[in-house]
Amino acid sequence: MERIVVTLGERSYPITIASGLFNEPASFLPLKSGEQVMLVTNETLAPLYLDKVRGVLEQAGVNVDSVILPDGEQYKSLAVLDTVFTALLQKPHGRDTTLVALGGGVVGDLTGFAAASYQRGVRFIQVPTTLLSQVDSSVGGKTAVNHPLGKNMIGAFYQPASVVVDLDCLKTLPPRELASGLAEVIKYGIILDGAFFNWLEENLDALLRLDGPAMAYCIRRCCELKAEVVAADERETGLRALLNLGHTFGHAIEAEMGYGNWLHGEAVAAGMVMAARTSERLGQFSSAETQRIITLLKRAGLPVNGPREMSAQAYLPHMLRDKKVLAGEIRLILPLAIGKSEVRSGVSHELVLNAIADCQSA
């Protein structure tokens, strides 16, 4: 069992990583006997894990209600969020309730925002079931729903009480979702840890076949890196922005193509190549390093080009609505070397459009 602490003073919390956690009531601390829980999951995961998690919580003496949401990025919306509020109010659940997010990034982000908003804030626990949510979205307290004009535009910073990562969940993960999660894994190597990127080049095949020790190390290392960044910059005023490598381009793809048509990790993968091409055009990143990124993404089964039907110009309106924009200026996360990156303002729109075009004609 691995245990990592996100250090945020009184709001510090543990990330527990192991197989078989759904069999242990102690995995769901700080829940105690007699407490009330609203378990939030989706239609895909409910048949797989709802009864198991409900059972282990009830074994601990917790009173469990549940709400089952539709599955898909297109349902990460205010309308679906309202169904969670309705379920909480119908019981009713008070300020002493705990929301448990059992699912991937959509369930986790939406449940976290529900917890931040319901009666001005209740406790919640993240139980991520996809690789992407285990290595990234469940850690750090970013919660949100989408708006038709932009991804994650309505949300809050709100930290969970704990994160419970049961590695056994990956056994039921579809290959496309596994690849999507690997995009965020590869991101950590590019922006923060060149040695980890080297390890990924050597061990990607083991991750693709869900090798237990390799996957446990991979998730632990990603969570360590994320925890360090969040502890240093919880509200994304500086260092934490680096975690958005590829996201300015990727969110544009997701919004333009319709939420759910491109998985988040797929869009981020293409976006990371666009960021690398931008950095190349600025003369601060080598084509050889871009090729290393492209090769690793391709091996993971990820796209390295944007959608053919989306023109370079179509990216700009979305990028100008990006949450990192300051004073009307796009801020990009750009690699300087494998393992090192920067936040860059003032890049000309023409250069950015040319970098996007590089990734459409490649």
From Swiss-Prot:
Binds 1 divalent metal cation per subunit. Can use either Co(2+) or Zn(2+). InterPro entries: Dehydroquinate_synthase, DHQ_synth_AroB, DHQ_synth_fam, DHQS/DOIS_N, DHQS_C. The keyword Lipid metabolism does not apply. The gene is aroB. It comes from Escherichia coli O139:H28 (strain E24377A / ETEC). Belongs to the sugar phosphate cyclases superfamily. Dehydroquinate synthase family. GO terms for cellular component: cytoplasm. NAD(+) binds at residues 71-76, 105-109, 129-130, 142, 151, 169-172. GO terms for molecular function: 3-dehydroquinate synthase activity; metal ion binding; nucleotide binding. It comes from the Bacteria. GO terms for biological process: amino acid biosynthetic process; aromatic amino acid family biosynthetic process; chorismate biosynthetic process. The keyword Mitochondrion does not apply. This is 3-dehydroquinate synthase. Keywords: Amino-acid biosynthesis, Aromatic amino acid biosynthesis, Cobalt, Cytoplasm, Lyase, Metal-binding, NAD, Nucleotide-binding, Zinc. The lineage of its organism: Bacteria, Pseudomonadati, Pseudomonadota, Gammaproteobacteria, Enterobacterales.
